[in-house]
């Protein structure tokens, strides 16, 4: 699975690099190249999501973690190999949803933070932002399952006599990252779910006209 993570991460990295080149060519000379601000915003948004959720996290945590953590602990494999499998296979459909979000309507041009009111029904009436939110949900589920797996592996699968203070710093870095992920990702999931219901079910969590607070989203997002 570690190897699959690397392959997926490299493929996503090439996709992200092509988006990055589009951004650089647009900004690299005076005047407009794309001639469409919405399209440019969609490229910037997709670039942010692809590079974070489909390049950095799968390679740095998924790839190196799956290869090195069991090796450094003296474990034969991760604690939950089948959950590990599922963590990986949630990522391709997540990336597909993200690419679909940029293809339908005029794309999700909200910036990678998906702030309301830019991500509200008024600015993005079609399903593009909803697809981006579902993509984030899948990537988040994948990350949370992976984090649970890493924490359990590091706590329970060490050689006998291998104390926590003797673990390599890489294992510690994965361990602490996984704990922080488990703390923060459910809050982000709550924020984008509230945004989803604001868009589709007439709630007003982030809509001032209904007593909501758009700044609340920023608090939840950056938590």
From Swiss-Prot:
Similarity section: Belongs to the heme-copper respiratory oxidase family.
PANTHER family reported for this sequence: CYTOCHROME C OXIDASE SUBUNIT 1
Membrane topology classification: Multi-pass membrane protein
Pathway note: Energy metabolism; oxidative phosphorylation
Catalysed reaction equations from the record: 4 Fe(II)-[cytochrome c] + O2 + 8 H(+)(in) = 4 Fe(III)-[cytochrome c] + 2 H2O + 4 H(+)(out)
Subunit composition and interactions: Component of the cytochrome c oxidase (complex IV, CIV), a multisubunit enzyme composed of a catalytic core of 3 subunits and several supernumerary subunits. The complex exists as a monomer or a dimer and forms supercomplexes (SCs) in the inner mitochondrial membrane with ubiquinol-cytochrome c oxidoreductase (cytochrome b-c1 complex, complex III, CIII).
EC number, UniProt record: 7.1.1.9
Amino-acid positions noted as binding Fe(II)-heme a in the UniProt annotation, renumbered to this chain: 47
Keyword Hydrolase recorded: no
Function: Component of the cytochrome c oxidase, the last enzyme in the mitochondrial electron transport chain which drives oxidative phosphorylation. The respiratory chain contains 3 multisubunit complexes succinate dehydrogenase (complex II, CII), ubiquinol-cytochrome c oxidoreductase (cytochrome b-c1 complex, complex III, CIII) and cytochrome c oxidase (complex IV, CIV), that cooperate to transfer electrons derived from NADH and succinate to molecular oxygen, creating an electrochemical gradient over the inner membrane that drives transmembrane transport and the ATP synthase.
Transmembrane parts of this sequence: 5-27, 47-69, 89-111, 131-153, 174-196
Regions of this protein lying in the Mitochondrial matrix compartment: 1-4, 70-88, 154-173
GO cellular component, as recorded: mitochondrial inner membrane
Top EC class of this enzyme: translocase
Residues reported to bind Ca(2+): 26, 31
Cofactor detail note: Binds 2 heme A groups non-covalently per subunit. Binds a copper B center.
Listed GO MF terms: cytochrome-c oxidase activity; heme binding; metal ion binding
Alphabetical keyword list: Calcium, Copper, Electron transport, Heme, Iron, Membrane, Metal-binding, Mitochondrion, Mitochondrion inner membrane, Respiratory chain, Translocase, Transmembrane, Transmembrane helix, Transport
Gene that specifies this protein: COI
Name used for this protein in its record: Cytochrome c oxidase subunit 1
Cofactor(s) listed: heme; Cu cation
Cellular localisation: Mitochondrion inner membrane
Residues exposed to the Mitochondrial intermembrane side: 28-46, 112-130, 197-223
One GO BP: electron transport coupled proton transport
Species in which this protein is naturally found: Sepia officinalis (Common cuttlefish)
């Amino acid at each position: 699975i570690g190897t699959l993570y690397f392959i997926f991460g490299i493929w996503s990295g090439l996709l992200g690099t092509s988006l990055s080149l589009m951004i650089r060519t647009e900004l690299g000379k005076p005047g407009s190249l794309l001639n469409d601000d919405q399209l440019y915003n969609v490229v910037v948004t997709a670039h942010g999501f692809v590079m974070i959720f489909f390049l950095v996290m799968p390679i740095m945590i998924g790839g190196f973690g799956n290869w090195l953590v069991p090796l450094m602990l003296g474990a034969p494999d991760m604690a939950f190999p089948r959950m590990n499998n599922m963590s990986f296979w949630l990522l391709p459909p997540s990336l597909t949803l993200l690419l679909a979000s940029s293809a339908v309507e005029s794309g999700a041009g909200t910036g990678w933070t998906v702030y309301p009111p830019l991500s509200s029904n008024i600015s993005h009436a079609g399903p593009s932002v909803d697809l981006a939110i579902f993509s984030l949900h899948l990537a988040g589920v994948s990350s949370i399952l992976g984090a649970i797996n890493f924490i359990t592996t590091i706590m329970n699968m060490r050689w006998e006599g291998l104390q926590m203070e003797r673990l390599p710093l890489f294992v510690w870095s994965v361990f602490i990252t996984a704990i922080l992920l488990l703390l923060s990702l459910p809050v982000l999931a709550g924020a984008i779910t509230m945004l989803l219901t604001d868009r589709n079910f007439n709630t007003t969590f982030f809509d001032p006209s209904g007593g909501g607070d758009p700044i609340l989203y920023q608090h939840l997002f950056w938590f």
